[in-house]
UniProtKB/Swiss-Prot annotation:
Region entry Involved in Mg(2+) ion dislocation from EF-Tu, spans: 82-85
Chief place where the protein resides: cytoplasm
Organism lineage string: Bacteria, Pseudomonadati, Pseudomonadota, Gammaproteobacteria, Candidatus Palibaumannia
Location of this chain's protein in the cell: Cytoplasm
Gene this chain is encoded by: tsf
Entry GO terms, CC: cytoplasm
Described purpose of this protein according to its UniProt entry: Associates with the EF-Tu.GDP complex and induces the exchange of GDP to GTP. It remains bound to the aminoacyl-tRNA.EF-Tu.GTP complex up to the GTP hydrolysis stage on the ribosome.
Name of the protein: Elongation factor Ts
Length: 280
């Protein structure tokens, strides 16, 4: 048997752009024959998938699923390159397969779910002719989990106490989170470094007005109140009834929000690609 050296694996990787482990496996199966290994990779569709793997996937769908007692939920983002494929039944079925497996097996690791579905992903890439990427996965546990989806583009999981008698309101709160994009439950949850960074920015902006120091201080304080309100769920105006804060609505019904997760298709992808480009 021919020794599968690092040099040989690198040569196959350079020629095919397939993953290192796939290259090594292909070479072992081909007994070190690099041309045969390439043919086998092509037959299995893995070269096609590898060649497409560098293409940006900014389209896709969000999927959510909750278990039978509504105490555990999963949310995933599955990406493709075009809106056309995102609406394709085969693509959506692939997503359903992933999230159902993640829920049933309580998988929260992105690497684990990717590894589990890599062969099916490669087959799908070959079928639709686009790069496909399981971008992220998250899970939520609690007394009661509510989910909300907006056109498969935005998904929310919400964990709350005392909400079993007000599931409709729970759905409305989840819908509010989808629309208004809060980052934290309440102001006290905002990390101090976030507050400090924003304060420096607003102070710098206000100082350019050349107004008296007292006025500048008032301007900054006002902008900071607005900033914290905009990213804190309980301090936002309720989208269904803007005359009331979300916190007021929840207090009236004695509902306590414990946690929430919000995914939107493609968010931060440009920043991620920029980071990858700088790293390469």
């Amino acid at each position: 048997m021919v020794a599968i050296t690092t040099t040989l694996v690198k040569q196959l990787r350079d020629r095919t752009n397939a993953g290192l482990m796939k290259c090594k496996k292909a070479l072992i199966e081909a007994n070190g024959d690099i041309e045969l290994a390439i043919d086998n990779l092509r037959k299995s569709g893995q070269i096609t998938a590898a060649n497409k793997s560098s293409r940006i996937t900014a389209q896709g769908i969000i999927l959510t699923k909750i278990n039978h007692n509504s105490q555990y939920g999963v949310i995933i983002e599955l990406n493709c390159e075009t809106d056309f494929v995102a609406k394709d039944k085969i693509f959506k079925n692939f997503g359903e397969d992933i999230i159902t497996t993640a829920l049933n097996q309580k998988i929260s690791s992105l690497e684990e779910i990717k590894s589990l579905f890599e062969e099916k992903r490669i087959t799908l890439v070959d079928t639709v002719g686009e790069n496909i990427n399981i971008r992220r996965i998250n899970t939520l546990e609690g007394n009661l989990i509510v989910s909300y989806l907006h056109d498969t583009r935005i998904g929310v999981l919400l964990s709350a106490n005392n909400i079993s008698q007000n599931l409709y309101l729970g759905k409305q709160i989840a819908m509010h989170i989808a629309a208004m994009k809060p980052k934290y439950i309440q102001v006290n949850d905002i990390p101090s470094y976030i507050i400090s960074r924003e304060h420096k920015i607003q102070l710098n902006i206000a100082m350019q007005s050349n107004k008296p120091q007292k006025v500048i201080q008032q301007i900054v304080e006002g902008r900071m109140r607005e900033f914290t309100r905009d990213i804190s769920l309980l301090d936002q105006n309720f989208i269904i009834d803007p005359s009331q804060k979300v916190g007021q609505i929840l207090e009236h019904y004695n509902i306590i929000v414990k946690n929430f997760i919000r995914f939107e298709v493609g968010e931060w992808i440009e920043q991620e690609e920029h980071y990858k480009a700088n790293e390469s």
